[in-house]
């Protein structure tokens, strides 16, 4: 029996402008080499570009993009009877949101374009419309899970 106390679950802080935890999670994933002010700059410029492109609330666009990209199921490698099988596993909301943010940023970094703010805004707008690299990644993950449904009993 462990003598350690249970770790307190940390809640994500909200950012200063939008007062939203989701925005802060995104900023922390954009962050590179400890340059948080640059991460704030990138995201706020992207939000401004979204406002100009769609003429709607950029926060709702961000929420919708993340909701569209969030996977329901993923594939995890499990070792059973001497061989490794890809086993489909359901994903919780927190982990799904984290994956969605990671995929959105990965897809926007791969995009051709001028700067990160422009690429991120384009990716978020595309994700709300059901296209883009992050949506492709989600569909690919769901396809993999569907193809390996036979191994679902290995959970």
Swiss-Prot record:
Keywords on record: Chloroplast, Plastid, Ribonucleoprotein, Ribosomal protein, RNA-binding, rRNA-binding
Subunit relationships: Part of the 30S ribosomal subunit.
The protein, known as: Small ribosomal subunit protein uS7cz/uS7cy
An annotated GO BP: translation
Gene3D superfamilies reported for this sequence: Ribosomal protein S7 domain (1.10.455.10)
Source domain of life: Eukaryota
Taxonomic placement: Eukaryota, Viridiplantae, Streptophyta, Embryophyta, Tracheophyta
Family: Belongs to the universal ribosomal protein uS7 family.
UniProt keyword annotation of Isomerase present: no
Name of encoding gene: rps7-A
PANTHER family according to UniProt: RIBOSOMAL PROTEIN S7
GO cellular component: a single term: chloroplast
Function summary: One of the primary rRNA binding proteins, it binds directly to 16S rRNA where it nucleates assembly of the head domain of the 30S subunit.
């Amino acid at each position: 029996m462990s003598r350690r106390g249970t770790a307190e679950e940390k809640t994500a802080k909200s950012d200063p402008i939008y007062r939203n935890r989701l925005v802060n999670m995104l900023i922390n994933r954009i962050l590179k080499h400890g340059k948080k002010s640059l991460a704030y700059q990138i995201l706020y410029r992207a939000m401004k570009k979204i406002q100009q492109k769609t003429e709607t609330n950029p926060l709702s666009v961000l929420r919708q993009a993340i909701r569209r990209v969030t996977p329901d199921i993923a594939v995890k490698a499990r070792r059973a009877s001497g061989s490794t099988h890809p086993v489909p596993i359901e994903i919780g909301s927190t982990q799904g949101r984290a994956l969605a943010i990671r995929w959105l940023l990965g897809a926007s970094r791969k995009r051709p374009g001028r700067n990160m703010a422009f690429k991120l805004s384009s990716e978020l707008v595309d994700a709300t419309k059901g296209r883009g690299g992050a949506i492709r990644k989600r569909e690919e993950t769901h396809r993999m899970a569907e193809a390996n449904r036979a191994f679902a009993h290995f959970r």
